[in-house]
Amino acid sequence: MNSENASLFRNILNDTENLVQPLTQDESRLALFESLVQSDQLLVEKIEKWEKKVSKFTENSKSEKRKLQLELFQEIIDLKKCIAFKPIIGKNAIDNNISDLKKNLHSNKKLEAVLKEELHQIKKFSSDLQSLKSSMGERQKQQAAMSRRGKKSIIHSAIIQEKERYEKESQELFTFLDGFLDEHAPSLLEGAQASIDKNRPGKNQPSLNFENISKKDLTEEFKQVIENLMNNSIIPGSPYIEVKNERIVSFLVLASLCTVDPQDPSKVKLIPFSDEI
């Protein structure tokens, strides 16, 4: 092909590209199409074909130029419909889906790790409470035995000091418990509500509206239940106590802190962790 024909051929390609461009809205697919055409043997064959046409073309004939532009445009449209082009588009969509799934999986794993850590802290805290309960019961027994034997004032003073130390430790523990529940009780009970709604047998039964309940009131109710459970655990036999809030019952059971009365699902009691140690 001589230089004049080559220049003319490039002008036709440029003009045709201007015709195709407004019809192509998806730039990513156009890039894929161009990559496919450049690497495909079909393009070589098309160029050779058009070189022959251009070599016979006279620049003065505008009608012939327009005709060649339309024919080249149709050739490009046919190439876009090539079977080899479709798998590339499909692969691109699959790759995007895989990328989105990986991002979601990573996010879910991070959330799972946070929830596991919170549950671990709650179980550890419950174990500490049980240890304190056992220690308190033992000290009360020792105090009762000493009182019956009528120990001297020095022993009585030691008991008073031990009692004061116990009361101080108990106060510190309950202060920590209050702070923990103030910060985490609403979110923990909200998770328990989600579990209740998921397992609710009747789809038409209305679920409790968590947002309409004061977080402060809910936290205070949760604190009262914990205090009642701890006081109740000191009683021989540790009878079950009634808890009216379904969310609190659900959370205590899911966190393996309490067991439910087989006769009444609204009654619970603390699991004796000290017996398992």
Curated annotation (Swiss-Prot):
Compartment(s): Nucleus; Chromosome, Centromere
Residue runs in coiled coils: 96-138
Annotated InterPro entries: Centromere_CenpK
One GO CC annotation: condensed chromosome, centromeric region
Keywords: Cell cycle, Cell division, Centromere, Chromosome, Coiled coil, Mitosis, Nucleus
Tagged with keyword Cell membrane: no
GO BP, one annotated term: mitotic sister chromatid segregation
Subunit field text: Component of the inner kinetochore constitutive centromere-associated network (CCAN) (also known as central kinetochore Sim4 complex in fission yeast), which is composed of at least cnl2, cnp3, cnp20, fta1, fta2, fta3, fta4, fta6, fta7, mal2, mhf1, mhf2, mis6, mis15, mis17, sim4 and wip1. Interacts with mis6 and dad1.
Sequence similarity: Belongs to the CENP-K/MCM22 family.
Function comment: Component of the kinetochore, a multiprotein complex that assembles on centromeric DNA and attaches chromosomes to spindle microtubules, mediating chromosome segregation and sister chromatid segregation during meiosis and mitosis. Component of the inner kinetochore constitutive centromere-associated network (CCAN), which serves as a structural platform for outer kinetochore assembly.
This protein's name: Inner kinetochore subunit sim4
Gene that this polypeptide is encoded by: sim4
